[in-house]
């Protein structure tokens, strides 16, 4: 009973730490991907690390830069050979030619959509990952450990294939020189499980700035750009000692 966040917060407090946390959207920190993860900052004593303000936003407002898109980071890569990606299933190859860039199964004609989705057609929820073709003009959706899972398909914007492992690595901001090992499925898993470089850099730099005395005061600046797409996901929004789980939204895609 109770949440993991509340448990961790109480344990840190017992050890004498002051914590701050939020659900951060990686796209708001220069990552070409909508990937939302909780980051908890902790300091021994009464000082609190302020939450880092977004450097990017969808429209580039309030002094932020515009989101980095998928096309921005993969457009210069050469066409991959077949050893650099897992092929789509026969079923996907049957229907994906009908899906345009940035669309998914909902763009199909009703009868075709019902046939393509099979039993999944009757499932609840948005099902936005089914027969999903990415858009070059938007950040990638959250990369998962396999790009060809039916409910979370990561299909290239214009080609009949998923993103290659090199494209996966670009989205997660690995240097091109980074060497991965193992089978192609293992490499996808390694990359999909990683923390995007920009998100880790944001957290690390905030700690360094705090340690160097560059952050004045314990309070956050006025947050004009939301940290994520969801509400009530920071330590200021939630009463740690009496959390109402209905107010804690942690629905990751």
Specify the residue positions occupied by each region the protein language model found.
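S-adenosyl-L-methionine-dependent DNA methyltransferase catalytic core
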Residues: 11, 37-186, 190, 194-253
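Conserved Class I SAM-dependent methyltransferase catalytic core
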Residues: 1-34, 38-43
């Amino acid at each position: 009973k109770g949440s993991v966040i509340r448990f961790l917060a109480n344990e840190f407090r017992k050890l004498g730490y002051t914590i701050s946390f939020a659900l951060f959207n990686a796209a708001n920190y220069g990552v070409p991907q909508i990937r939302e993860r909780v980051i908890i900052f902790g300091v021994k004593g009464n000082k609190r690390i302020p939450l880092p303000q977004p450097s990017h936003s969808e429209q580039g407002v309030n002094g932020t830069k515009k989101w980095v898109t998928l096309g921005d980071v993969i457009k210069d890569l050469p066409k991959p050979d077949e050893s650099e990606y897992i092929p789509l299933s026969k079923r996907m190859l049957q229907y994906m030619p009908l899906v345009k860039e940035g669309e998914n199964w909902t763009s199909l004609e009703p009868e075709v959509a019902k046939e393509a989705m099979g039993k999944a057609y009757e499932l609840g929820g948005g099902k936005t990952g089914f027969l999903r073709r990415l858009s070059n003009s938007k950040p990638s959706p959250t990369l998962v450990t396999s790009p060809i899972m039916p409910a979370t398909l990561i299909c290239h914007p214009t080609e009949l294939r998923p993103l290659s492992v090199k494209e996966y690595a670009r989205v997660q901001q690995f240097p091109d020189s980074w060497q991965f090992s193992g089978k192609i499925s293992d490499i996808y898993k390694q990359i999909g499980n990683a923390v995007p470089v920009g998100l880790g850099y944001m957290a690390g730099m905030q700690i360094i700035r705090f340690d160097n005395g560059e952050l004045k005061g314990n309070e956050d600046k006025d947050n004009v750009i939301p940290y994520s797409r969801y509400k009530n996901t920071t330590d200021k929004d939630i009463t740690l000692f009496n959390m109402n789980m209905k107010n804690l939204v942690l629905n990751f895609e």
